[in-house]
Amino acid sequence: MNQLRCIKYLCIYGNNKEPNTKNRLDSAEKMSVQAEIGILDHVDGSSEFVSQDTKVICSVTGPIEPKARQEQPTQLALEIIVRPAKGVATTREKVLEDKLRAVLTPLITRHCYPRQLCQITCQILESGEDEAEFSLRELSCCINAAFLALVDAGIALNSMCASIPIAIIKDTSDIIVDPTAEQLKISLSVHTLALEFVNGGKVVKNVLLLDSNGDFNEDQLFSLLELGEQKCQELVTNIRRIIQDNISPRLVV
């Protein structure tokens, strides 16, 4: 890739929502993320996404010629690999790959690339959570990093996406966006939310993923979905700025 420009954007935003009478939302909670595009050479697209202590880099190679067993005659085939921060990949990473595939498949205009292959590799540099118990922070960062890398690679997409981790604290029932490792340890339930956006990131089209683990009731679910939509909307707005800052210098006036 020639003269790739690395763009870093830091966004810090908080929850200004009024407390819910049944499930109080932590109004002091803030989410801090960093994103960088075009960080790797010798691949078609790459990105780095950092959220608190969780850091993921993603590379995209494609469209390329697939192996015979991978080829799909009418659409693009996806090869998704997740590599852990420590050790070798296990069943845990295979589950992350399946969830990541479920999120990315509806976003890509696959019929534009028949008999081709796109390789998406996510390397987790820092987990930011107890890997034996949780994977929501890693999954959320992998989703966001993969989307940015696909844009950097110039792969045709149908829509945008943004993903956030959420936790419900055990004693207070506070709904925390982007929880820390310490907050996860005292959580009643944990959730990874990924939403699909259209119309320039202004309209939510679909819930791509809601991966939940733990105990929660219907009211808490609706509350976290409401808060999650608000936070994903803010995140996708900042992702658009990152993309705009990256693409603008490449345009020929």
Predicted segments, located by residue:
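Polyanion-binding surfaces on beta-sheet-dominated domains and ring/shell assemblies
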Residues: 1-253
